[in-house]
């Protein structure tokens, strides 16, 4: 068995891409998208028609906002024709500090999916793991709208999401790794910070262990990988969402895959509970320079790509 096949024995494999033609060969269970991945996909000739059709059908009726939503849903529906499970569709990052607007947008996206015959159980609404986003997820989950909490870089964010009843979280491995590597500069020791000691891997393992120790049902889906080594160090995580490039490397890899994360190990671990009410959340996040900076940066980057997509829509609509 190749490494991808071995990994599937321990973990649900998810494709992290808007390029739905490319994901077919890896037969993922679920798929995730984000504004950056959708922007990248619509710039390819083979997906241009989805953008043009959305502009043609909706620009005169609802403007750019309606077209943006239609593009997200169009990609989601195409992906759901390929994967047997769920697709993650992201709420505009510019709503990350507005609970009411996030709830309204999520409900609208689910309504659009349901109008196309897609059951809400097959859709995860991606929301940034700000305090306001987590409160939106709490409301949505009560409505039966499942949420995927993204841009998650710290244990306190993870605990707040679980206590809000979020369906799933996406802790970002690679971006955590990037931050620590950049901070270390020339002092970075690749060997000492690789494998199980990779700071991004350690963060996800800490969150996974906490959830399993205290019996939270929220799913943990490691995301944002820079290498297959990071992925294989998290074998056993509930889900891992992986880019096509890294899926290809795993499919070509022949080394053994070791089961790294397990419920039994987590439950046996000595872990202290933490408080994740609003004052504690804001303080602990503020104390974590990496998480604070990467959350802010991630929101800015996703928002910038949403603006680029709007400009692209405007050019086509002329």
Swiss-Prot record:
InterPro entries in UniProt: Aldolase_TIM (IPR013785), TAL/FSA (IPR001585), Transaldolase_1 (IPR004730), Transaldolase_AS (IPR018225)
Q: Where in the cell is it found?
A: Cytoplasm
Q: Name the chemical reaction catalysed here.
A: D-sedoheptulose 7-phosphate + D-glyceraldehyde 3-phosphate = D-erythrose 4-phosphate + beta-D-fructose 6-phosphate
For this protein, what is the EC number? 2.2.1.2
Where, by residue number, is the active site? 126 (schiff-base intermediate with substrate)
GO cellular component terms attached to this protein's record: cytoplasm
UniProt pathway annotation = Carbohydrate degradation; pentose phosphate pathway; D-glyceraldehyde 3-phosphate and beta-D-fructose 6-phosphate from D-ribose 5-phosphate and D-xylulose 5-phosphate (non-oxidative stage): step 2/3
A GO BP term, please? pentose-phosphate shunt
Q: How does it associate, per the subunit comment?
A: Homodimer.
Q: Which NCBIfam families does UniProt cross-reference here?
A: PRK12346.1, talAB
Regarding protein family, the annotation reads: Belongs to the transaldolase family. Type 1 subfamily.
- The protein's name is Transaldolase
Q: What's the source species for this entry?
A: Cupriavidus taiwanensis (strain DSM 17343 / BCRC 17206 / CCUG 44338 / CIP 107171 / LMG 19424 / R1) (Ralstonia taiwanensis (strain LMG 19424))
Q: What is the lineage of its organism?
A: Bacteria, Pseudomonadati, Pseudomonadota, Betaproteobacteria, Burkholderiales
């Amino acid at each position: 068995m190749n490494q991808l096949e071995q990994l599937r024995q321990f973990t649900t494999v998810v494709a992290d891409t808007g390029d739905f033609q490319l994901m077919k060969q890896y037969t993922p269970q679920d798929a995730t998208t984000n504004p950056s991945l959708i922007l990248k996909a619509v710039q390819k000739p083979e997906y241009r028609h989805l953008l043009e059709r959305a502009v043609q059908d909706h620009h005169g009726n609802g403007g750019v906002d309606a077209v943006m939503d239609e593009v997200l849903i169009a990609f989601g529906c195409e992906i759901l024709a390929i994967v047997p499970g769920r697709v993650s569709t992201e709420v505009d990052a510019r709503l990350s500090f507005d609970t009411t607007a996030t709830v309204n947008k999520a409900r609208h996206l689910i309504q659009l999916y349901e109008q196309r015959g897609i059951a809400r159980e097959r859709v995860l609404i991606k929301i940034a793991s700000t305090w306001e986003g987590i409160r939106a997820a709490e409301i949505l989950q009560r409505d039966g709208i499942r949420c995927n909490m993204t841009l998650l870089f710290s244990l306190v964010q993870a605990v707040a999401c679980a206590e809000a009843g979020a369906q799933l979280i996406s802790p970002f491995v690679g971006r955590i790794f990037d931050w620590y590597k950049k901070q270390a500069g020339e002092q970075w020791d690749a060997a000492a910070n690789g494998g199980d000691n990779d700071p991004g891997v350690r963060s996800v393992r800490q969150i996974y262990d906490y959830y399993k120790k205290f019996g939270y049902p929220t799913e943990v889906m490691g995301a944002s990988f820079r290498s297959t080594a990071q992925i294989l160090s998290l074998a056993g995580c509930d889900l891992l969402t992986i880019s096509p490039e890294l899926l290809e490397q795993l499919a070509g890899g022949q080394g053994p895959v070791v089961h790294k994360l397990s419920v039994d190990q987590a439950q046996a671990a000595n872990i202290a509970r933490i408080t994740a009410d609003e004052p504690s959340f804001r303080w602990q996040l503020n104390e974590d320079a990496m998480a604070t900076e990467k959350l802010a940066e991630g929101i800015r980057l996703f928002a910038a790509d949403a603006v680029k997509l709007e400009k692209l829509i405007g050019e086509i609509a002329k």
